[in-house]
Amino acid sequence: LAVKTHVKGDFPKDLVALHNFKGGYCGVSKVENDIINLCYITNFEAFKKFKNIDEFQEKVVFKNKYLNSIFKNSQPVFETPLTIGQISFSSKSPIENHMIMCGDTAGMIHPLCGNGMSMAIRSAQMASQLIINYLQGKIESRIELEKAYQKSWNKEFKTRLKVGHFAANIFSKNQLSEMLVPIIKQIPNLLPKIIKLTHGKPMVVKCAC
């Protein structure tokens, strides 16, 4: 289950915060018009004990003192939060019934990695270039096109998804994350390396002008 809402309140414009709670995590950032974007994700096991979102927030999310302070000291912009259920981070195939999958349809990375949109753009770029090569006769058959895309997709994204899934599992487990955060603080180079594994290399676009 993912829940998103916009609120007005006091929060730095140059900060993106990530806070966890039992069974999930919440991202906080300033967006346009001085609005604070609050978005959290949790699993069904953590949520099913409660009647509604309000009760879940009061009894679970607000156990995190930082989230409690942000929610309680802000004014909602939305009448009701936006929600979406049945989100799947399970493995998918870049090719389905001979159709090329791009973005989340090929594999959805956890939101805490903050890299879903760039993955969608990058996979579309990869698919476009291979399709152009196919239409120009540089790739001889549709089967070769599919194999080339699958190989390129796995090389570009498979590790990112695995690392993102691993990081999300750790972050949604309070005791484990509380134990690991001090360790990460003691090893300054560790966090940038983890982030790099979920983001890959910068995308290069060739100008045809």
Question: For the regions a protein language model found, what residue spans apply to each?
Answer:
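FAD/FMN-dependent oxidoreductases across multiple families
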Residues: 48-131, 136-139
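Generic recognition of cysteine residues
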Residues: 26, 39, 102, 113, ...
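Short capping/connector residues at structural and topological boundaries
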Residues: 12, 23-26, 30, 36, ...
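Glycine-rich, flexible loop/turn motifs
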Residues: 3, 12-17, 67, 80-85, ...
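Conserved FAD-binding catalytic core of PHBH/FMO-like flavoproteins
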Residues: 1-62, 66
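C-terminal helical "tail/cap" subdomain of flavin- and related membrane-associated enzymes
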Residues: 132-209
